[in-house]
């Protein structure tokens, strides 16, 4: 909450927050960033990830999903 009683919504996530959202470890998220699968920006010594970039990654992974044997 800020001084006006309004909840602040983060405009970006940290690597730890993205790892928690996706159920991954932080090292896996960093590897996704290094590999270019997940976009990020450098903020000092940290990396920041916009929520829409997380959505892009999830959509990309969903489009690569193989059909399951029972849906064929």
Identify the role of each PLM range.
Residues 52-72:
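A short, Lys/Arg-enriched interface patch at domain edges and termini
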Residues 5-6, 46, 50, 62-63:
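Intrinsically disordered, low-complexity regions enriched in Ser/Pro/Gly/Gln/His and often acidic
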Residues 2-31, 60:
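Polyanion-binding surface elements
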Residues 21-48:
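Major-groove DNA-recognition helix of helix-turn-helix-type DNA-binding domains
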Residues 17, 38, 44, 60-63:
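N-terminal cationic amphipathic segment used for targeting or macromolecule association
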Residues 10-12, 43, 47-48, 55-58:
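General detector of folded, globular domains
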């Amino acid at each position: 909450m800020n001084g006006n009683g309004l909840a602040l919504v983060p405009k970006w996530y940290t690597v730890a927050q993205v790892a928690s959202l996706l159920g991954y470890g932080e090292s896996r998220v960093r590897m996704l960033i290094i590999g270019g699968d997940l976009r990020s920006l450098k903020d000092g010594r940290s990396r920041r990830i916009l929520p829409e970039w997380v959505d892009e990654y999830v959509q990309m992974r969903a489009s690569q999903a193989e059909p399951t044997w029972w849906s064929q």
